[in-house]
Amino acid sequence: MTLSNFTDTSFQDFVSAEQVDDKSAMALINRAEDFKAGQTVHFPEPIYAANLFFENSTRTHTSFEMAERKLGLTVIPFDPAHSSVSKGETLEDTIKTIGAIGVNIAVMRHAQDGYYNDLLGAWPTTAIVNAGDGAGQHPSQMMLDLMTIHEEFGHFDGLSIGIVGDLSHSRVARSDMQMLHKLGATLHFAGPEQWYDSSFDQYGDFITVPELVKQVDVLMLLRVQLERFNADHRQAFSKETYHAKYGITDDLAKTMKPGAIFMHPAPVNRDVELASDLVDGPQSRIFTQMQNGVFMRMAMLEAVINARHFGEE
């Protein structure tokens, strides 16, 4: 399946893992690999994008902007702190405003889970691309993770994948586990029990960190998200205690399978989720994920552009 085979409605907006099936996942991976190999695309008419990030971001924000510029899109600057949202304007009215002035694609991140549900169709000629909603979904991180795993192993079916850490607060974990389960991977979870959601049982089992580390092909660490905790949770662990009990130490890493890899959505808390030297070690694919993120976001944006017929004469 290629991107040109997508139906017009498949990716008119790109907001959640539920939109992606196994065929479209592989089509996006293949297209991202094309871009990584140097393929380019040209749109006959101008396309305008705005990046509306209401939460702090380094990787996702700059990665989307790089993807937009590589595709030849015109990026319209948007600063939430100096926007009318700070004066009380609703997100829906913000989308209507940028749509009215001609923005085709709004890439958005917001702390509210499912914020995009009220924005889909707010302006008929403006597409919504979700760059992360609270603890809900993170489809572009999901897709770049899939690309990185496929690049390493060439398949998903039968792979053993472990996700460790702050599971209940992680939009990355939610998106990744849904898609990896669809693709036939075996999933294992580990971390503090109070940070685990029983709804994840449908995707895999919850085991100890040492048990998980020795049996997985992909070890995905999650950032400890202090900004989403209440005061009591912040005091649950010191960095040193967390690293010793739930982090990947140098000694624990020695028990990994040959050929197994580390992944992390970043930013990494060095010597908390993962020993600092392992972040830059030969088993780490953390910076490969960042590289792949640009090409995958190019593929995702192109899918939206094709579905909407943007840029056509």
Swiss-Prot record:
Where do the annotations place carbamoyl phosphate binding? 59-60, 109, 138, 141, 266-267
Q: What is its EC number?
A: 2.1.3.2
Query: Origin, by domain of life?
Result: Bacteria
Transferase found in the keyword field: yes
As its record notes, the protein acts as a catalyst of: carbamoyl phosphate + L-aspartate = N-carbamoyl-L-aspartate + phosphate + H(+)
Q: Which GO terms describe its biological process?
A: 'de novo' pyrimidine nucleobase biosynthetic process; 'de novo' UMP biosynthetic process; amino acid metabolic process
Q: Name one Pfam family in it.
A: OTCace_N
Mind listing the GO molecular function terms for this protein? Answer: amino acid binding; aspartate carbamoyltransferase activity
The entry's L-aspartate-binding residues are: 87, 171, 223
Pathway assigned in UniProt:
Pyrimidine metabolism; UMP biosynthesis via de novo pathway; (S)-dihydroorotate from bicarbonate: step 2/3
* Alphabetical list of InterPro entries matching this protein: Asp/Orn_carbamoyltranf_P-bd, Asp/Orn_carbamoylTrfase, Asp/Orn_carbamoylTrfase_sf, Asp_carbamoyltransf, Asp_carbamoyltransf_Asp/Orn-bd
Provide this UniProt record's keywords sorted from A to Z: Pyrimidine biosynthesis, Transferase
Q: Name one GO cellular component term.
A: cytosol
Q: Is Transferase found in the keyword set?
A: yes
Signal peptide annotation: none
Broad class of enzyme this protein falls into = transferase
Q: What protein family is recorded? A: Belongs to the aspartate/ornithine carbamoyltransferase superfamily. ATCase family.
**Whom does it interact with, and what assembly results?**
Heterododecamer (2C3:3R2) of six catalytic PyrB chains organized as two trimers (C3), and six regulatory PyrI chains organized as three dimers (R2).
Give the protein's function: Catalyzes the condensation of carbamoyl phosphate and aspartate to form carbamoyl aspartate and inorganic phosphate, the committed step in the de novo pyrimidine nucleotide biosynthesis pathway.
NCBIfam families per record = asp_carb_tr, PRK00856.1
- Return the protein name: Aspartate carbamoyltransferase catalytic subunit
User: What is the originating organism of this protein?
Assistant: Lacticaseibacillus paracasei (strain ATCC 334 / BCRC 17002 / CCUG 31169 / CIP 107868 / KCTC 3260 / NRRL B-441) (Lactobacillus paracasei)
